[in-house]
Amino acid sequence: GGISGICAAVSAARAGVKTILVQDRPVLGGNASSEVRLWILGATSHMGNNNRWSREGGLIDEILVDNLYRNKEGNPVLLDTLLLEKVRNEPNITLLLNTAVYDVEKRSPDEISKIYGFCSQNYTFYEISGRLFCDASGDGIIAYRAGAAYRMGAEEKQVYGELFAPDKGEYGELLGHSIYFYSKDTGKPVKFVPPA
């Protein structure tokens, strides 16, 4: 249910494929949701170039233009709603929010036949069968459980010849935890009461 998962699901649905979009959170958007607030940047901001003439096309552009028109203030909760509407408007998509994939079943060494999910909100277990599966989870749970090769952290630029990729040690291997807070000027002192 992140941006890449939404785009994959909507594209498949528009091509006539019956699609199930599984999202482990209560909102869509992944890192771009109101829970994290890493805005959809794509080509417009890669390695700090902030190229105002760069622009994503396709579904990303459709989402960004719709958001710009309907959400002029950039409210992250409105983006959540817009993304939910985008998915719900596709009759070929079944959406499973608050559902975490935890295992896979394979019909052969190289082919997944089923994934298993659990919705913590209504205690429902899901068995989802299909011919194609897209792992856009961010942590690669489907690929990992299927036995695919994987790496943790960022690869160095020479691995794939990516000019904008970081050099060794340029940033840490894994993302840390984050704490989000708001602050505002109330125009007067505010008493802080620490939690008990």
Annotate each predicted stretch with a short phrase.
Residues 122-132:
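Core beta-strand elements of the Rossmann-like FAD/NAD(P) dinucleotide-binding domain
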Residues 114-119:
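Short beta-strand segments that buttress and anchor functional surface loops
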Residues 5:
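N-terminal Rossmann-fold NAD(P) dinucleotide-binding loop
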Residues 142-196:
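Rossmann-like dinucleotide-binding core of oxidoreductases
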